[in-house]
Amino acid sequence: AEVDRVLTATGSRWGQLDTIGEQEHRGIARRMYKAYPDLFAEGTVRAVSSYSPRSIMSMYSFTHELAQQSSAISVETASGRQFNTLVRNFDIDEEYKAYRNDTAYAGAYGRYLAQNLTVEPLLRLVGENYELDYETISDLALAEYYVAAGMNAMGLEFDASKYFTLEEYKRLWSIFNFRQYLLY
C-alpha cells in the first residue's frame, strides 16, 4: 500500500525537482540573502549547473529567489556538460574515482552493517518463511528503511512507527548514513 502511494504521488516523475525541492532552494537563497545582505547589494550573480534537468531547476529556483530578494543584482545562469568539472567533480576527480573503485571501505561498511543491521521490520512485513541470503535480506531491510524515510521527504504523511521501533529506525538510519558518508 505504501509503495502504491509513492508511485501515485510521483506519477512517473522520478528525478524531477518537485515543489518541495523548489521550496528548499528558495529557502536557502532567502537565508543566504538575509545572512549576507552586503554580498547582494549590487553586482551580478552567476550560477552554473550540470546538464541534469533537476540540477537546472534547482539553480533556477535558487537564483529566482535571489532576484526576488534584491532588485539591485542581475542574475546570469548557464547549464551544460561544459560545467561538469565544476559541479560533477565526482565523475571526473581521478582520486575520488579510484577511492570508489577501491573496495577498502567495504570492510568497514560490512562490519558496521553486520553489527547494526536489524531485519525484524522486514520479517514482520513479509513473514519469516522467506528463504533469503544475507545480502538480499540486508538490501531489502535497507530498502524498506529508504522508502519509509523518503515518504516524509516527498511530503507524504507516513507513520514509521507502524513498521519500525524507534531503535530499529535509528539503526537502519545509521547504516544508510554511514554508507553515504563513505561513498559520497
What role is predicted for each listed range?
Residues 1-44, 52-184:
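Signature for phosphate-centric chemistry
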